[in-house]
């Protein structure tokens, strides 16, 4: 790949320094002084790059690999060609992610639109708002009355922070986001176009049509949450909408009013979560999953992409399909359908015996 002007390579680290940072082990101390500057996939890694492997199936990709180091666990070390330095880690994927963050710290947060180091002249900040030391406000951002923003937080261009909103320290609010009726913890990352705290979808059928139900709750976002671009999180109706500590939400996810999401969950793009759903800790939800309102999903649940959740899901299970059922049942049914389809294809128009 040609030089990437958006993310420039690191000035360089010795492999011994990188291994120490990762809490890993350099397989051969003779390689301690090898310099690395970047991360890359194994198939196109070049001198100065670090890559990683998770399977023996990666063996063939070493044919085009010119990396300066490979991260893997001890069981796969024999797959790596002998001339390549090896960093041994019990969790190569996590170690590779840590290396990427070390080489490219700026890529861990939304890209700044301007070079502002303080408050842009065109930003609109209500006199009653409280900004701690080191807050950066980019051009045309608006911060409402009595809002509070913690030290080291960056407010992106054209973003809107509503009245009385509280944002913690070391947060990144990207360009074009809007935040209303919300309390946000420390270290939170909110990407471009996110909408937080708008009306939930609440109506009561009446004799002359729909009657709006007031939405008077809040959104609570705990520490170290990351929210992807154009995701929408409605404020609670009478209770709060809560996103638990460390949870990561992809782009274009809709979270309805009163939803409670636990800690360290992962929610992939285009998921829709209807109101008052409760999701436990460590839950993983695949893309385009639809979740009915007022259901409870237990801790550690994994949900396959495109599933429809209509009932409560027990903790620790894997589920898939519409309506969702245990994943092994769903996969068995899918295999049976494929088998039946192939049989019909071999005997078009044929009669079936009763």
From Swiss-Prot:
InterPro entries (UniProt xref) = Hexapep (IPR001451), Hexapep_transf_CS (IPR018357), LpxD (IPR007691), Trimer_LpxA-like_sf (IPR011004), UDP_GlcNAc_AcTrfase_non-rep (IPR020573)
What EC numbers are recorded for this enzyme? 2.3.1.191
Q: Look up the record and name the pathway of this protein.
A: Bacterial outer membrane biogenesis; LPS lipid A biosynthesis
UniProt-listed NCBIfam families: lipid_A_lpxD, PRK00892.1
Q: Which reaction does it catalyse?
A: a UDP-3-O-[(3R)-3-hydroxyacyl]-alpha-D-glucosamine + a (3R)-hydroxyacyl-[ACP] = a UDP-2-N,3-O-bis[(3R)-3-hydroxyacyl]-alpha-D-glucosamine + holo-[ACP] + H(+)
Functional note: Catalyzes the N-acylation of UDP-3-O-acylglucosamine using 3-hydroxyacyl-ACP as the acyl donor. Is involved in the biosynthesis of lipid A, a phosphorylated glycolipid that anchors the lipopolysaccharide to the outer membrane of the cell.
Q: Which HAMAP family match?
A: LpxD
Subunit record text: Homotrimer.
Q: Which protein, by its recorded name, is this?
A: UDP-3-O-acylglucosamine N-acyltransferase
Q: Which organism is it from?
A: Rhizobium etli (strain ATCC 51251 / DSM 11541 / JCM 21823 / NBRC 15573 / CFN 42)
Gene symbol here is lpxD
Where does the secretion signal sit in this chain?
Answer: none
Question: Which residues catalyse the reaction?
Answer: 257 (proton acceptor)
Q: Which Gene Ontology BP annotations are present?
A: lipid A biosynthetic process
Region described as Disordered: spans on this chain: 335-354
Identify the enzyme class: transferase
PANTHER family listed in its UniProt record: UDP-3-O-ACYLGLUCOSAMINE N-ACYLTRANSFERASE, UDP-3-O-ACYLGLUCOSAMINE N-ACYLTRANSFERASE 1, MITOCHONDRIAL-RELATED
């Amino acid at each position: 790949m040609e030089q990437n002007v958006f993310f420039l390579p690191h000035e360089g680290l010795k492999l011994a320094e990188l291994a120490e940072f990762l809490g890993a082990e350099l397989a051969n101390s003779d390689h301690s002084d090898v310099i690395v500057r970047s991360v890359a996939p194994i198939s196109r890694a070049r001198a100065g790059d670090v890559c990683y492997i998770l399977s023996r199936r990666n063996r063939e990709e070493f044919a085009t690999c010119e990396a300066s180091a490979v991260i893997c666990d001890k069981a796969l070390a024999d797959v790596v060609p002998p001339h390549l330095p090896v960093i041994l880690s019990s969790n190569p994927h996590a170690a590779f992610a840590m290396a990427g963050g070390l080489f490219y710290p700026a890529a861990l947060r939304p890209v700044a639109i301007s070079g502002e180091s303080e408050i842009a002249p065109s930003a609109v900040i209500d006199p009653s708002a409280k900004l701690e030391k080191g807050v950066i406000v980019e051009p045309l951002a608006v911060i409402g009355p009595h809002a509070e923003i913690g030290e080291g937080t960056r407010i992106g261009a054209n973003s809107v922070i509503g009245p009385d909103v509280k944002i913690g320290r070391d947060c990144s609010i990207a360009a074009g986001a809007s935040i209303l009726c919300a309390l946000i913890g420390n270290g939170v990352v909110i990407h471009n176009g996110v909408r937080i705290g708008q009306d939930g979808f609440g109506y009561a059928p009446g004799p002359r049509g729909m009657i709006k139900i007031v939405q008077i709750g809040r959104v609570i976002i705990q520490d170290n949450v990351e929210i992807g671009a154009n995701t929408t999180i409605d404020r609670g109706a009478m209770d709060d909408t809560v996103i638990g500590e460390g949870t990561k939400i992809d782009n274009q996810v809709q979270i309805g009013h009163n939803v409670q999401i636990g800690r360290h969950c992962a929610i992939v793009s285009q998921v829709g979560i209807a109101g008052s759903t409760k999701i436990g800790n460590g839950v993983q939800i695949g893309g385009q999953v639809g979740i009915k309102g007022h259901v409870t999903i237990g801790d550690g649940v994994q949900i396959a992409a495109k599933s429809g959740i209509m009932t409560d899901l027990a903790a620790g299970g894997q589920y898939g399909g519409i309506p969702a059922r245990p994943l092994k049942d769903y996969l068995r049914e899918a295999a049976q359908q494929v088998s039946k389809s192939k049989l019909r294809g071999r005997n078009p128009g044929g009669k079936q015996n009763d």
